[in-house]
């Protein structure tokens, strides 16, 4: 799907821009050096926004999630399993890792609100869904927004729960898309 290519490449560009600025400013790509460096408040907020959106396009977060449902519906089940079980989780890990290394002391309320809107929006779209692949895709979007919310919240005990939830979702979403494929092969619908 062209949506998949466009949105994930746009996300990659934003992450690359933030990473390049970090390496240029710090003078090193080592996490220990980056962790010790102090960014100004404007730099921290700008970098967090770039990383939030860049990885958010790949996760995907609200309102940039439409490519995921289109991709899941159009793609074969094997790719849906790979996309939901690995690619989306890799973006979550990237956001978590860079966010934990940078440890910005900024107000993340607007980012938490965006993720919360994604949870509610996906829940409402799941309500009357008749396409089972779209239903599973919206479930993935809902849960990824919930985990993104947890990572933006920043509390260490909640983040641990988010990591466990991410691993669990990786296995269960793969299983759900496998079951969708089984139903499709059995009933051709």
Region locations from a protein language model:
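Hydrophobic transmembrane alpha-helices and their helix-loop junctions in integral membrane proteins
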Residues: 1-189
């Amino acid at each position: 799907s062209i949506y998949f290519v466009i949105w994930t490449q746009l996300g990659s560009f934003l992450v690359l821009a933030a990473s390049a600025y970090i390496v240029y400013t710090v003078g090193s790509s080592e996490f220990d050096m980056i962790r010790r460096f102090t960014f100004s408040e404007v730099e921290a907020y700008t970098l967090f926004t770039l990383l939030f959106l860049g990885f958010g396009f790949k996760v995907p977060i609200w309102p940039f999630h439409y490519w995921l449902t289109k991709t899941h519906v159009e793609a074969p089940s094997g790719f849906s399993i790979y996309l939901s079980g690995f690619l989306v989780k890799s973006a979550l890990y990237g956001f978590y890792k860079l966010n934990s290394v940078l440890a910005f002391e900024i107000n993340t309320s607007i980012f938490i609100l965006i993720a919360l809107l994604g949870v509610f929006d996906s829940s409402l779209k799941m309500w009357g869904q008749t396409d089972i692949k779209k239903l599973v895709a919206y479930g993935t979007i809902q849960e990824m927004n919930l985990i993104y919310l947890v990572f933006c919240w920043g509390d260490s005990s909640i983040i641990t729960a988010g990591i466990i939830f991410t691993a669990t979702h990786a296995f269960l979403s793969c299983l759900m898309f496998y079951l969708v494929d089984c139903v499709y092969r059995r009933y051709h619908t």
